[in-house]
């Protein structure tokens, strides 16, 4: 697997002014960092928790740093959702998902339109029989002691994707959702139904 970051720094979490920005203590200096994961992460974001950041690669970025991970009980959890598709593609190409050995990735960010509804899915897979498999990749960062749960926040976009996947399945497509559970102690998974208000 490729090296994702040249330089990784450790900082301490101090606050979250909005869904996409956190304040951190970096060696005594207060800094802002972009948080690419908009989930609630209530079980992860505690004052003083160690976060892993990298210098922002975009010169016009609003923050100097970008969050890539967080530590929980000595385990580093990847929060950089920009790389979720890379991880999924690595797992598929190296045949590390039992039952998916016949599939290979042919496109990323693939848009499908059906009955006037258009959705962009993370990966388009194919096999030697020419079948297509539309895959949505979700990064799961909500955990109990031994369980993984998803989602940790209401997402209309995510709901739309799942409903569209179901419609496409009814039209004959192979469809699926791959949950990247980043908690090695998880032995079970629960889909949460969140209140809409």
Regions found by a protein language model. Name each.
Residues 31-42:
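Beta-strand/loop nucleic-acid-binding surfaces
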Residues 55-60:
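Short, charged beta-turn/beta-strand-edge "cap" motif at the junction between a beta-strand
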Residues 61-73:
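OB-fold/S1-family single-stranded nucleic acid-binding modules
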Residues 97-115:
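A short acidic/basic microdomain associated with nuclease active sites
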Residues 190-196:
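Conserved small/polar residues in nucleotide/adenosyl-binding loops
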Residues 19-23:
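Short aromatic-glycine-enriched beta-strand elements
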Residues 40-51:
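Short nucleic-acid-contacting surface segments enriched for D/E, G, S/T with interspersed K/R
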Residues 11, 121-152, 165:
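Conserved catalytic cores of phosphodiester-cleaving nucleases, focusing on short active-site segments
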């Amino acid at each position: 697997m490729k090296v994702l970051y040249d330089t990784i720094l450790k900082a301490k979490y101090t606050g979250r002014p909005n869904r996409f920005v956190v304040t951190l203590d970096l060696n005594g200096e207060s800094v802002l960092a972009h948080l690419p994961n908009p989930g609630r992460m209530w079980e992860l974001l505690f004052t003083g928790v160690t976060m892993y950041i990298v210098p922002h690669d975009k010169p016009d970025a609003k923050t100097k740093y970008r969050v890539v991970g967080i530590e929980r009980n000595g385990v580093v959890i990847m929060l950089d959702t920009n790389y979720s598709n890379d991880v999924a593609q690595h797992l598929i190409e190296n045949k590390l998902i039992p039952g998916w050995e016949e599939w290979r990735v042919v496109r990323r960010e693939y848009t499908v339109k059906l009955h006037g509804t258009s959705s962009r899915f993370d990966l388009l897979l194919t096999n030697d029989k020419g079948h297509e498999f539309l895959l949505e990749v979700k990064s799961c960062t909500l955990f109990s002691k031994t369980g993984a749960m998803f989602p940790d926040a209401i997402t209309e976009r995510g709901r739309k994707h799942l409903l569209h996947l179901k419609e496409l399945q009814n039209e004959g497509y192979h469809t699926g959702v791959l949950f990247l559970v980043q908690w090695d102690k998880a032995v079970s998974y629960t889909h949460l139904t969140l209140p809409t208000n």
